[in-house]
């Protein structure tokens, strides 16, 4: 990639951590879902490569998350030749060490997610402890946007916890009842 050529490994690592976070949101929210064939670039004819992407197993998405995080853990300590990312990074202002701690925290999280299917739980529990030791040591280090306040909610939080207006309309419910639809 161009970041590897120019030596902007912190920027690349940040992208890998963000990819892992977003893949985690998808896997945690939907379970089995399109992932490996989803959101791929368009072909020359303007059509997506996969109009009906296949479902990936949630566990496969978690495996991809771990690959993103492993790559980030390799890239982040290498630093950037330019310091351009700092002003564009709303979370850690380009601090590669802070992003590295986040990557290790996420490794702990997703190792725990996979623990139920692990064939070596004791080893994975030990890994979790090692990842936690390399992650945050205080609440001040958490990944948080400083742009949100009581009147400016994080959109994911707002969607998850403020959905009082999302309900079936009376006409829709009446149609379901009329047709003996169990939904």
Model-derived features: positions:
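Structured, solvent-exposed acidic/aromatic patches
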Residues: 1-183
């Amino acid at each position: 990639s161009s970041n590897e050529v120019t030596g902007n490994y912190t920027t690349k690592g940040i992208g890998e951590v963000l990819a892992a976070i977003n893949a985690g949101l998808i896997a945690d929210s939907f379970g089995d879902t399109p992932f490996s064939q989803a959101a791929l670039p368009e072909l020359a004819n303007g059509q997506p490569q996969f109009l009906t992407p296949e479902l990936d197993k949630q566990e496969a998405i978690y495996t991809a998350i771990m690959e993103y995080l492993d790559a980030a853990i390799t890239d982040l300590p290498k630093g950037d030749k330019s310091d351009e990312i700092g002003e564009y990074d709303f979370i850690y202002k380009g601090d590669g060490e802070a992003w590295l701690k986040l990557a290790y925290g996420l490794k702990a999280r997703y190792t725990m997610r996979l623990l139920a299917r692990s064939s070596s739980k004791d080893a994975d529990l030990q890994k979790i402890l090692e990842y936690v030791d390399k992650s945050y040591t205080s609440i001040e280090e958490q990944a948080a946007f400083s742009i949100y306040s009581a009147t400016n909610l994080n959109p994911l939080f707002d969607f998850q916890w403020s959905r009082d207006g999302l309900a079936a309309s009376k006409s829709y419910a009446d149609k379901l009842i009329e047709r003996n639809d169990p939904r």
